[in-house]
Amino acid sequence: MKEIKDFEKIRIKIASPDQIRSWSYGEVKKSETINYRTLRPEKDGLFCERIFGTTKEWECYCGKFKSIRYKGIICDRCNVEVTHFKVRRERMGHIELSAPVAHIWYYKYIPSRIGLLLDITASNLNSILYYEKYIVIEPGDTDLKKMQLLNEDEYSEAKERYGMSFSASMGAEAIKTLLENLDLDELSSKLRLQMIDKDDKTDKKLLRRLEIIENFKVSGNKPEWMIMDVLPVIPPEIRPMVQLDGGRFATSDLNDLYRRVINRNNRLRKLLLLNAPEIIVRNEKRMLQESVDSLFDNSHKRKVVKGTSNRPLKSLSDALKGKQGRFRQNLLGKRVDYSGRSVIVVGPELKLHQCGIPAKMALELFKPFVIRKLIESESVFNIKRAKSLIEQEVDEVWQILDNVIKEHPVLLNRAPTLHRLGIQAFEPVLVEGKAIKLHPLVCHAYNADFDGDQMAVHVPLTPAAQAESWALMLSTNNLLNPANGHPIVFPSQDIVLGLYYLTMERKNVVGEGRKFSNFNHVLLAINNKSLDYNARIYVKVDGEYIETTAGCVVFNEALPGKISFVNKTLSDYELQNLISEVYVVYGSSIVIEMLDIIKELGFKYATKFGCTISMSDIIVPEEKKVYVDKANREIAKIQNDYTKGVITGEERYNNVVSVWSKTNEELTNKMMEILKKDRDGFNVIYMMADSGARGSRNQIRQLAGMRGLMAKTSGDIIELPIISNFKEGLSVIEFFISTNGARKGLADTALKTADAGYLTRRLVDIAQDVVVRIEDCGTINGIKVEALKNGEEIVEPLREKAVGSYSIERIKSPITGEIILDVNEEITEDKIKLLETVGIDKLVIRSVLTCEAEHGVCQKCYGRDFSNNKPVNIGEAVGIIAAQSIGQPGTQLTMRTFHIGGVAQAGSEDDKIALKNSFILNGLEGFNVQVDGGLLFTRKGTLRVINVIYEEDIKDIKEFKVLDSQKVIKGMPLFTSKDGIDVLSSHIGYVRIKDNKLMIVSEEQEISLKTGTKLEVNVGDYVEAGRVIGTFDPFAEPIIAEVRGKVKFKDIILGTTLKEEINLETGNIEKRITDQVFESLDPRILIINDRGIEIASYVLPGDAYLQVEDGQDIDIGDIIAKLSKGSEKTQDITGGLPRVNDLFETRIPKNLTEMAKVSGVVQFKAIQKGKRLINVLDEYGVEHKHYIPAGKHLLVRDGDVVKAGDMLCDGRINPHDVLEILGGISLQEFLLAEIQDVYRKQGVSINDKHIGVIIKQMMKKVKIVSVGDTNFVYNQKVDKHTFYEQNKRVIEQGGEPAVASPILIGITKASLNIDSFISAASFQETTKVLTDASIAGSVDDLKGLKENVVIGHLIPTGTGMNLYKRVKVRENSSSEM
């Protein structure tokens, strides 16, 4: 027999009236429910036993037949079939409606589906359905038009005038007739022709109408089924009625809603029989329509039907919708039996794979197992007796429990489960008390602490579940974070402090300088108190004496034998690195052993250290006053400049904030220096921060330095800093300023948690069906990766980006020519080292972004699974892992929107350019002019530099072994020295011989320069490290004259485009261009020569401060006007979570930039409707128009040459523009870089492939640009694979394929547009999704995880994949062996 679960697809359609009647077991004719005396269902009522089945098992209503032997017999007295009472859960009834009624889902929801089919507006449709207007069905030979609406008077007039020669009616009957008369094929071809005529300007309505018509055609649904003649009644057990203690009844709201429908229906039937006046019948029909609407969707109506306690009744739609609806409450989230929860306490004595379960809890959880063992051991013979033994808690029960619990894993879960490590399996150990004991090292994965957190325990029951728990979920198998492959099980707090103390070195202690021949001697000396843990000693390791400390020896002695000697002071960072290295070299079993040893040692020596904090440990630097006085002097100078009118108010504010930030930073450095020297580095506060056990530099600064600048509630920074620290104590005003920040912090945290949770939910929804389904998709495309650099420092090395991926190309050594990496070979750590030694720093790798698997991704494109550092298994749910990896750190991201001027976090802005390395200036780009001994950049520019990695004087060289400009790698001979020794290169780079020096230099790098930068070096110069090569104003952007001449104002009119403000603080007059836009006025400054000819023109953006007068002589390099950075302060740089949200939802940013659509020459045109037209002429002379809001600060001038994708004005980039102008690959790179940037700033490491999985899902669809011979509709959005398949079919038949362009869809929209209607319906907008799916007759292939959970199947991933389900286990016969 086939099980009900053995189906592979599920389909949803509109039910026809015949279908509804075929489901039904009888008509519900009365609105009664239960007889109040007998408490039995009323005949023909909503709970009738004849229709829905008997309420008593194997017994009819009247009691004539009472026994299972009469099964299936229908009683001749009461007509009730003798069955099991459970049939009341599945038998349906129906109500025959006296007048047709429209289904609210199809007419009320926007866009109204019936309205689209008939081309009637929603409001008109409403007035027809609610019997307010007539609609002409057949105009006959009258002046009326088909589908014309008539009110009462017009209808009466037409009746008088034309008599019976036309037909018009109202209500659902009229709509039903119209729907029956529709010819879908004819309508479809008519609309397709209209679309071709309209071409580009297609309106959305046409597209929607066509889609709905096509859906009806394909699905086999008939449009008239949206109007109902018969109403299904759901089984009574699903809308139960129960008696409460007081004799009253509690009933489901649906019964009340059905009752209203039945009452009105019966009343209407009577009125029709009585031939009542039309107006009464019509009113009753309208009420019937309303009552059916309420039954289907009560919340969507204007006038909600309310129950007894004045609360809206819950209709069928409400039962599905939202968090409390059927999908999310009962199908996706269920409560589980065999589970318990309790408070957690730390269990330092546990092994990593163990957890402590309170004995009483374990007994309850494992009760069935204990009962079985009791019966097997013949202590008892039935379950009842076994239960009573367990309740008495006899000794035998505890013995049995001990045996049952051995090797039976339990799952521990801590809410919120943000990633998969929030549920792990442990072996239970029975403990006294009522609290669950948790191993201290797994706290990080759970984000647990012991301040009252609770955890839940679940018991896996079946052998398969236990096997999976052991093999996949055991805590010792989850040592790495799936987001990035770093260890997630590592010591923190006490353990770190203990080991830091143990491995530190202290001067002048017992036993300093002694030599020991082996570890045992060291331990003996420590035990005899003749050697201090922190003493510097010499000990023999592998036959050589090394300098170390006694504590290091103790640490290494305890480690497993294979690990090489660890000789450094261990901070938390060092410990994590150690764990990583040991994992890579020796595997997980050694790591697990090592972790438990580290835990024991850490706790032991933290106890021995016994550190305490006192006020004397908090040392305030004596120099503090000096720093503060210096800052006050600088601020006085800034104030003076402001009073003179040299700088604007915003610049003054920015400068003040900058001064305090710098002062605070300098003071903190001094303070840390003092703390480090205090007590030979054994200052407890410093030790805690330095070891990474607790506290940070920032917190110590507030204790012993100065609290610094605080932010207002608006996010602006209060320029009055808190100079005191907590040791000195705050003044009243300082305390009051502090309260702002504290309150904001708490409010942010609460909002952030909900926001991050919602982000995770949306990400899971879009990626839930991305599973590794095949081994190799065979693609030849990949993406380029290289180390991510910020100027000269490497932010993310190539290793992070490439390890674990597969190469697309064959890579040979540039020196020997041998193959280092072959096509489709995994890039391992060793391969990366090899590539680095030969100087290869760019790779093309396979990526999820370019994977061509039809569903999900393939093994080769995904690469390594970071949770175990092995190639990913087929069946791994990588989409969910990706969503969790991005969503889980979401709670750590800030909600705050940073201001450009906001420097509470940002530190001070520098006004100098100086590089950390020596370098050679290789070239300049950007418009610059020569002014007194330097170069002044009048627009943004770029420096091209090559860093000097190594240099040697030529006079010490006897013979060169390399040529100028030759590439060298590590270990290559460079020259022979005077002593005849060959000197080898210790770096990779290029040889440069210059100024009597032999240098090794890096590849060229670009450094961007701001407008107004003054450069003091020339191309070709060699510059030492740290030398200042240029200066600029960080708080203002100048507009600079590039020619000599006379100033002439154009369209700068006082009171219109120019505003003169008297600064009340300084009494100076400030001239500012207004940000109002005038059609005919375009404020600019012209520069004219002696002959009065215009030689330069500068457009002035809104809010620019003028620095020149009309008619004034001007020289090259003079500042004409400047834009204060403060005016940019209002343009928030959205950081943190809101930014990630915007990127994933592909929202168009507020302050938008305009990107050049093509490469070419810029031409300025006039301002029209508040927008400036800028044309870019491409190489063929074609003009491409760009409209930029007037008053925006332009980054180009008339006649400039731009590249496609260059920004023409300042602002934020729109991801959709990137896709349109630069294409899909650039968009992927842009989104990846922007999202990673937010996480990286918060110190969160997420591997690119996780974000790649989500971006891939956002770019799954394409938009049809040309239809060809396919069935697509112009502008329709379809799945890439559907598109390719249709085209393939059309090409095979010799037709013309369709053309489409890629589009980017935000995650919420993409989740709703997903192929699976079950998944989409359980996400958001449930009723809308189901409405559209039913019209289209959608089939859900049950490919994703969510739909299978809802249906109750095993999820198709991991061991639940069909691939693995079909595995048969056969015994080997002896002959084969």
UniProtKB/Swiss-Prot annotation:
InterPro entries: DNA-dir_RpoC_beta_prime, DNA-dir_RpoC_beta_prime_bact, RNA_pol_asu, RNA_pol_N, RNA_pol_Rpb1_1, RNA_pol_Rpb1_3, RNA_pol_Rpb1_3_sf, RNA_pol_Rpb1_4. GO terms for biological process: DNA-templated transcription. Zn(2+) 1 binds at C60, C62, C75, C78. One of its GO terms (molecular function) is DNA binding. The lineage of its organism: Bacteria, Pseudomonadati, Spirochaetota, Spirochaetia, Spirochaetales. Belongs to the RNA polymerase beta' chain family. This is DNA-directed RNA polymerase subunit beta'. It comes from Borrelia turicatae (strain 91E135). DNA-dependent RNA polymerase catalyzes the transcription of DNA into RNA using the four ribonucleoside triphosphates as substrates. The keyword Zinc applies. Keywords: DNA-directed RNA polymerase, Magnesium, Metal-binding, Nucleotidyltransferase, Transcription, Transferase, Zinc. It is an enzyme of class 2 (transferase). GO terms for cellular component: DNA-directed RNA polymerase complex. Mg(2+) binds at D449, D451, D453. The RNAP catalytic core consists of 2 alpha, 1 beta, 1 beta' and 1 omega subunit. When a sigma factor is associated with the core the holoenzyme is formed, which can initiate transcription. Its EC number is 2.7.7.6. It comes from the Bacteria. Its cofactor is Mg(2+); Zn(2+). It catalyses: RNA(n) + a ribonucleoside 5'-triphosphate = RNA(n+1) + diphosphate. Binds 1 Mg(2+) ion per subunit. Binds 2 Zn(2+) ions per subunit. Zn(2+) 2 binds at C777, C851, C858, C861.
